[in-house]
UniProtKB/Swiss-Prot annotation:
One of its GO terms (molecular function) is nickel cation binding. It comes from Prochlorococcus marinus (strain NATL1A). It is an enzyme of class 3 (hydrolase). It is found in: Cytoplasm. Belongs to the urease gamma subunit family. Its EC number is 3.5.1.5. It holds the Pfam family Urease_gamma. This is Urease subunit gamma.
Length: 100
């Protein structure tokens, strides 16, 4: 099986996001890479579910709270950008200040 560099990147995001989700479910706080991966995964899955870019950008500011991440993480993540595949093509989704 051949995977393009983009497909490999997405698989790494998914793997990190699944680990982050397990940690969230155990009540642990996410670090910076885990938070970015988890947010990115939510965008990818939302696009796959047929949600619009604007819906994802709006919802993306409510997925994680300051209480769910380690101290200092919200200040490090000013925006998350992820290319996601929508029914009408690939689009860039930007989450501005996603952890509030």
């Amino acid at each position: 099986m051949y995977l393009s560099p983009q497909e490999k990147d997405k698989l790494l995001v998914v793997t990190a996001a699944l680990l982050a989700e397990r940690r969230l479910n155990r009540g642990l706080k996410l670090n910076h890479p885990e938070a970015v991966a988890w947010l990115s995964f939510q965008v990818l899955e939302g696009a796959r579910d047929g949600k619009s870019v604007s819906t994802l950008m709006n919802e993306g500011t409510r997925w994680l709270t300051k209480e769910q991440v380690m101290e200092g993480v919200p200040e490090l993540i000013h925006e998350v950008q992820i290319e996601a595949v929508f029914p009408d093509g690939t689009k860039l989704v930007t989450l501005h200040n996603p952890i509030r």
